[in-house]
Amino acid sequence: MESPLGSDLARLVRVWRALIDHRLKPLELTQTHWITLHNICQLPPEQSQIQLAKAIGIEQPSLVRTLDQLEEKGLITRHTCANDRRAKRIKLTESAEPIIKEVNNVIDSTRNEILNGISQEEIQLLSNMIAKLEKNILELYNKS
């Protein structure tokens, strides 16, 4: 019987995410919040919800709930775009900066603990294999 690699990878992602969520709980944030805030920081200022959804790799309706939560927490603001009233621009608030630093510290320390005992060469090898798997999957997906 062949190795259930897909199941193993899915389980790894699930437990990694659960640990991140557990460690972000004192900040009343989740990994989904962190990924969203991280991408807002990486994109040029005041990106649209559509651009943010594309950067994260999710559909815009899936993003709206997370943005609602971040807005309720006072970490972002959204305003209507002057050129396209259907589009909303996203901006981090001043109070988001210290929270983002704290979240990044939690994420970085957790990642370091998870990777403890694994060499840089092993990490690079794993990253290369994951990239090959992703490439193969995308090629198969695009063929069908």
Curated annotation (Swiss-Prot):
DNA-binding interval(s): 49-72
HTH marR-type domain segment(s): 2-135
Highest taxon of source: Bacteria
Pfam families registered for this protein in UniProt: MarR
Annotated GO MF terms: DNA binding; DNA-binding transcription factor activity
Keyword Mitochondrion: no
InterPro entries with a match to the protein in the record: HTH_MarR-typ, Tscrpt_reg_MarR-type_CS, Tscrpt_reg_SlyA, WH-like_DNA-bd_sf, WH_DNA-bd_sf
Assigned keywords, A-Z: Activator, DNA-binding, Repressor, Transcription, Transcription regulation
Described function: Transcription regulator that can specifically activate or repress expression of target genes.
Family stated for the protein in its record: Belongs to the SlyA family.
Subunit structure, as described in the record: Homodimer.
HAMAP family documented for this protein: HTH_type_SlyA (MF_01819)
PANTHER family: TRANSCRIPTIONAL REGULATOR, MARR (PTHR42756), TRANSCRIPTIONAL REPRESSOR OF EMRAB OPERON (PTHR42756:SF1)
UniProt-recorded name of the protein: Transcriptional regulator SlyA
Species the sequence originates in: Sodalis glossinidius (strain morsitans)
